[in-house]
Structure formats: C-alpha cells, structure tokens
Amino acid sequence: MGCVPPKVQIEAAPQFDPSRISSLAVLPFQTIKTPQLASSSRGGVRDPEEIRTQFRLPGTDQADGTEFKKVRYVVPETAAHRITKQVASVLSGRPSLRVIGPEESFSVVGEESSEKEMALPVMAQKVGAHLKVDGVVAGLVRTYREREGSKLGAKPAAVGFEVYLIRPSDGMVLWTGEFFEEQKPLNQDVVGFFEKGGGFVTAATLAELGVNKVMKAFPVGLGEQGPPLPAPSPKEIP
C-alpha cells in the first residue's frame, strides 16, 4: 500500500494565544483564479494565484528538468461559498464565541475589496475595526475537482483549501490550517476509503470532511479542551 501524505497541516505564530480571542468575523473565502501566474505574497497571506506543492494535482506544475508545464483547474465560486458556510457553522456552534457571519463581515468592505484588489490582511483590519472583533477568519479554496463516475468506480474528487486567522490590529496571520485530499482507492488508503463509506465521494462531501478536520484543530472557543498548538515555525507564516 502507498504512503498517504498528511491531509491537514497546521501552523501557528508564536504570538497566538487562543484564550485572548472571544469574538470572530468570518469573511467569504476566495478562490484560485485561472489562468494566473505566480506572484509574491502580500502581508503574510498568499495571493489566490499562488499554488504550493501540496496543492498540485497529478499532471500539474511538473518539472522534468527542461520543461515546466502549468495547468490550472477552475475553482467554482459556489465551492468557496459552501466551505465558508461550513466554517462559519462550526464556529457558531462554539458557545463561548461571538461569531459574525460572512454576509455582515463582507458588507464592511463590499465592492471596494474587488475594485482595489484588497489584500486579505487589509480587509481583516477594516472588518475587525468596524465590527470590533478579536480575530478575522478568512480562507482560500485552491482545488475543487468533482468526482467523475459513480461511487464504486470513478476519477476521484480532489479538494484543497486554507483557513487563516488574522489579527485585526496589524493584519498578522496568527494561525493557518491547510487541507488537501485527492481521494485514494482502497489499496492506497484503507482508513481514508472506509472513512468515506467505502466508496468514492463527491467534492462536496470531501470538502465537508476537510472542514471538520481543519476546524477540529482550530483551538479558538474550545477553552482548555482545545487541541495543542504546533511548535512555532521559524519561517514566515505563508
């Protein structure tokens, strides 16, 4: 059986203290725009067109020593909307948190964010100051490929997204949760295959499973029962 890479990766800044956050605003998640070329990061949060290695699907961004072919997959806006709602729903279920949903949060910046291509940290600062919250949750959907075929035999679905917790006072990314999974067949991922009912699931189901896994690792609003934070990474939070 093949080796299955981690489906969830977590990073936390040394300054992150979950106990200091009792209110959150959730911004609508962004999507990868295609076709795009990679560009440098802004303010600690990667631009939507930047694709990291773990979020490349088979056959994309492969280097053979002389050629470097880039193929991009279209991520539908409906996928970002669905994942945003799922994240907001999980957070709203934590009684100790005051959560402001994506509609009210986005109304603070509205069309201005699209017209000026406003970076996420800047949006978070404006939203946080206006709504008077301790943190702003934002995200990026990098991959959303639907299953082709039936549950019993198919080209599997693939979903990849990131969740950011941003400090409104200065736009710093305090916590990042990343999820990517292209469902594997039984002989490559026994646990994962039966976790999904013993068949190939849709992208919507895979996304819901991913949100649950990432948010299980999100310690805000869980008190002392929250998951331990990972050791701070010496590199800049992406």
Question: How does the language model describe each region?
Answer:
Residues 3-25, 30-37, 127-131, 153-156, ...:
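C-terminal/domain-edge helix-coil "capping" segments
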Residues 10-11, 122-124, 147:
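Short structured motifs
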Residues 29, 140-146:
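Generic short beta-strand segments
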Residues 34-140, 168-176, 209-218, 222:
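N-terminal segment of the mature soluble domain
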Residues 34-35, 145-147:
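Short catalytic/ligand-binding loop motif for oxyanion handling, primarily in non-cytosolic enzymes
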Residues 107-109, 145, 183:
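Generic structural signal for helix capping and beta-alpha/helix-loop junctions
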Residues 148-152:
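Short beta-alpha junctions and helix-cap segments that line functional grooves
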